[in-house]
Every structure is written in C-alpha cells, then in structure tokens.
Swiss-Prot record:
EC number, UniProt record: 2.8.1.13
Domain of life: Bacteria
Keyword Cytoplasm: yes
Protein name according to UniProt: tRNA-specific 2-thiouridylase MnmA
Record PANTHER family: MITOCHONDRIAL TRNA-SPECIFIC 2-THIOURIDYLASE 1, TRNA 5-METHYLAMINOMETHYL-2-THIOURIDYLATE -METHYLTRANSFERASE
Record-listed ATP binding positions: G12, M13, S14, G15, G16, V17, D18, S19, M38, G127
The species this protein was found in: Lactiplantibacillus plantarum (strain ATCC BAA-793 / NCIMB 8826 / WCFS1) (Lactobacillus plantarum)
Gene Ontology CC: cytoplasm
Cysteine pairs bridged by disulfides in the record: C103-C200
Site location (Interaction with tRNA): H128, Q345
C-alpha cells in the first residue's frame, strides 16, 4: 500500500456531507489531511442565525470526529470583488449570470488553492462530483462524475489543466446514496444534512428580496411581441428566458395555455411574454459565446462537432462549434433547435465523458434573426 503520510491535502469543507466524506476518505487513505472552511459571505438567515457559523460548527464536529486539524478562512473581499460585482454587472445588462462557475474559478480553485499552498498543501480536495485523468506529460482531463444526477463538471468548466494538477475529486467515482451511507456508518454529524441549494455561498435566500438590496428594481410593461399589454413586471432582472412562474397571468381563451417569458428589451424596459411551452420565440438555432476557457491546450481546429449543455442538469445537445478569426468568440450551431438559451449562462462543451471547457452566452439566434433576450 502506498504511503501517503507525507502528502498534505487541504480539503475545502463546507459543513455539508460531501466534503465531510472527502475528508474522511483521504484520512482513511493515510494522507496528511487539513480541513478549511471558507467564509465568503456575511450571512444570516431569516431567523437571524448566521448560517456560516452553523456550517462551521458542523465542520468542527466532523474534523474532531475523524481527527484532523481545521481552520476557517475569510474570503469575503475576494468573493465581493471577483464574483459578486460580476454577478450584479450581468444583471444590470439584462443577463442571467451563473455565479457558481465564476465562484469555482476565482474562489475555490484560485483564492483557496493559493491559501492551501501557503499551508504547505500538495493538493486541495473538494466534494465535487467529477473525475480527473492525466496524460503521461501531466496534462489533466476533466471527466463527468459517475453519478450522472450529481455530475458537476458544468460548474468546473472554466478550470484549466494546470490548476487541476493540484486538485483531487475523491467523490468522482461515487454515487450520492453511497456517500451518505459512508457518512452514516462513520457517525459523521453531517450524514443526514440536506444538500444546499441556491447561489454559491449565498444559500437559500429569497432571491428577489436579496437582489433588490443591491439593484434598484424598475417595473415596466409586460406585453406580447404583437403589442398586447398583459400586465406589469417587477423589474427585468427578476425574470429569465423560458420562465413560467411569477408572471401573474393565467391561461386564457379556449386553449388555456400557460404564459412564459419569451424576451426582454432592456432599453425599453419591456418584458415579452408568449403562450405555450413550445412558443417559437423560445427556440434558437445557434448562439454566440465569448469569455472562452478550455481545460487543455489541445488544438480543436476552427470547427468541431461535440455535445453541449446550456444549463446545469440539462440533457446534452449535439452542436458544431466555429471559432471566429482570433479565437475570442464561438458560434455554436445546434443539431436541433434548443429552447430557452439564456445570455449570461455558460455553454459547456463535452466530448463523450470529457468536459472540454466553456464560454459565456452572449446572444441567441433563430436563423439570421437575433432573439430579443436582453
């Protein structure tokens, strides 16, 4: 058996079951394990309880149980500067950002990685469901997690091979029920803790209320593309393309079909709505994306056919990717039209099991027509 006792792994511990089991597994495998809790947001829930304090208590219980040292590090300034200002800027532009992708790139795998290296780490480890594979020359490839329901490569798609050389994903070969079982058998305090949902590090806040603290809402007209006014919207930032809930207009007429958000006009402050899940205004034939990041330096050529996801947990779609002349932008053409392409979200590229990288969606098109989504 390999002796890992001289290999230090710093585990990003959130107070959840996944990162708890990561620390447990690495400790069982004989690594020199250190737990670190990242506090990235000054947070209290609606009952006035600081959720970060509660999570840190869980980290302490787990670390004490498995016998590892643990620390807390405050990244609030880095999070504000690198993630949250980006998040607000995107909403101001009428887009729907994905802060988790940026949070991983800038905080968990940059600020935290740097901090861990200062602690003498050889590697960092997190509770992400993803796998790594390395070539003989050290190039790292990012692969989907075995648990297809939990695979998190979508959120890791802006990391590069050099960063991943210093990373471990011990849960990549596991499925969630087995992770919980391990935690229960080991008597970990987090074994039955529910998974967190919501924005990276901000948790389960009322999103509308939360966003309203930082950006003034400007109500405006809610109307159809042919000019029928259907009501008033609360502020364009609260709506995303394809959304059904929260519009306050029920189905009407004989068909009684529900209404959906089918467009936005930031300049005129209009929210466009249309009837039917398959409303033609919701379908795009291609998109343009920029802010491109690929995991490896492999030359993919100017055109390549792969699959892509346009949001987390969506089924892959076949696409052809075409680079512009200076490789700063791609046009992604879909094998079949895709519903509710959303500017600000990530388009993530896959070749089979491998996550190749991603870009941020700037605009969606139906043939030559740009869709009015911002």
């Amino acid at each position: 058996m390999t002796d890992h006792s001289n290999t230090r792994v710093v585990v990003g511990m959130s107070g959840g079951v996944d990162s708890s089991v990561v620390a447990l597994l690495l400790k069982q495998q004989g690594y020199d394990v250190v737990g670190v809790f990242m506090k990235n947001w000054d947070d209290t829930d609606e009952n006035g309880v600081c959720t970060a304090t509660e999570d840190y208590k869980d980290v302490a219980k787990v670390a004490d149980k498995i016998g590892i040292p643990y620390y807390s590090i405050n990244f609030e300034k880095e999070y504000w500067d690198r993630v949250f200002t980006y998040f607000l800027d995107e909403y101001k532009k009428g887009r729907t950002p994905n802060p988790d992708v940026i949070c991983n790139k800038e905080i968990k795998f940059k600020a935290f990685l740097d901090y861990a290296m200062d602690l003498g780490a050889d590697y960092i480890a997190t509770g992400h469901y993803a796998r790594l594979q390395h070539d003989e020359d050290g190039t790292m490839h990012l692969l989907r997690g075995v648990d297809s329901n939990k695979d998190q490569t979508y959120f890791l798609s802006q990391l590069d091979s050099k960063t991943l050389q210093k990373v471990m994903f011990p849960l990549g070969e596991m499925v969630k029920p087995d992770v919980r079982k391990l935690a229960l058998n080991a008597g970990l305090a987090t074994a039955k803790k529910k998974d967190s949902v919501g924005i990276c590090f901000i948790g389960e806040k009322n999103f509308k209320e939360f966003l309203g603290h930082y950006l003034p809402a400007t109500p405006g007209k809610m109307m159809t593309f042919d000019g029928q006014v259907k009501g008033e919207h609360a502020g364009l930032m609260y709506y995303t393309i394809g959304q059904r809930r929260g519009l306050g207009i029920g189905g009407d007429g004989e068909d009684n079909e529900p209404w959906f958000v089918v467009g936005k006009d930031l300049k005129k402050n209009i929210l466009y709505v249309g009837k039917g899940y398959h409303n033609p205004h919701l379908y795009a034939t291609h998109l343009k994306a920029s802010d491109l990041h690929f995991v490896t330096d492999e030359d993919l050529g100017n055109d390549f056919h792969v699959t892509a996801k346009f949001r987390y947990r969506q089924k892959d779609s076949g696409v052809t990717v075409h680079f512009n002349d200076d490789h700063t932008e791609v046009t992604v053409t879909f094998d079949d039209p895709v519903r509710a392409i959303t500017p600000g979200q990530a388009v993530v590229f896959y070749n089979g099991e491998e996550c190749l990288g991603s870009g941020m969606i700037d605009a969606a098109y139906n043939d030559e027509r740009v869709l009015q989504y911002v």
